[in-house]
Amino acid sequence: YVKQYPDRVVIENPGGFLDGITEDNIITHPSIPRNKLIAETLQNLKYVQRTGQGVDIIFKDMVSMGKPYPRYRSFNDAVSLTIFSAIDNTEFVKFITEVQDKNSKIMPLAEMMILRDLMDNRKEQLSELSRKVQKSLDETKKSCNELVNSGLIEIVSPYYMPIVPLL
């Protein structure tokens, strides 16, 4: 089912998540097709590709547009996805656009999510960032190091923090 509201779109699908998929690993879990009709509909909306990157695309689009993260919920008999329309932070959108234009490359999703989190929370430990981006500690540290090397965040042990003038 697709339900459209003024502030969000809710997509519901009968049946729970497939084995191994949870709300806490939906971004990084390998894609497993579940409902061909919904996949085709989302593909037509340009939110899904056949390569199994639909969740990544939805998250990346929402983050880069300054919107809340998409919300996945699993119930015993259904899964729902809520995509919000409101823009939470226009300054973050401008910032990400400037960084990507300056570097002439699209920022990876994990790095965008880390920056967004640090902008919202001002400081965070690696373990918490790892949980939020749904990656291993090593993968998250690598993303953080990229941001440190780019001059976007700094380490004030044990925290990662945004460079104040940037965010």
Task: Tell me what each language-model feature is.
Residues 1-167:
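C-terminal regulatory or interaction extensions
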